[in-house]
């Protein structure tokens, strides 16, 4: 019984999504996996569809994603993002791997591994 209680507590604590960092979470709707901004009560504002790899630091989120079957690199400027902002203000991409590596060095983006 102790093990079952412990398991229930572990499952209830923390993020229930596969990835979360602050208000950002990976969620699924109708079989589509998305990275979004959680505004509460199970409501998300989508940022990038079909993320495959996500890494974050205090300023940025780096994402390797394959929306519409085309894979590319993206980043989110966390300092500019908020629940009322339009995605074009803070979601940048798509980039090729080479372009993204240059941006990683210049902006100190979190490093991605595919």
Where on the chain are the PLM-derived regions?
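Sec-dependent bacterial lipoprotein signal peptides
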Residues: 1-15
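A generic structural signal for short, solvent-exposed coil/turn residues
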Residues: 4-7, 53, 67-68
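N-terminal export/targeting and maturation segments
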Residues: 15-60, 64, 72, 84-86, ...
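Structural motif
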Residues: 68-77
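C-terminal partner/receptor-binding element of secreted or periplasmic proteins
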Residues: 82-114
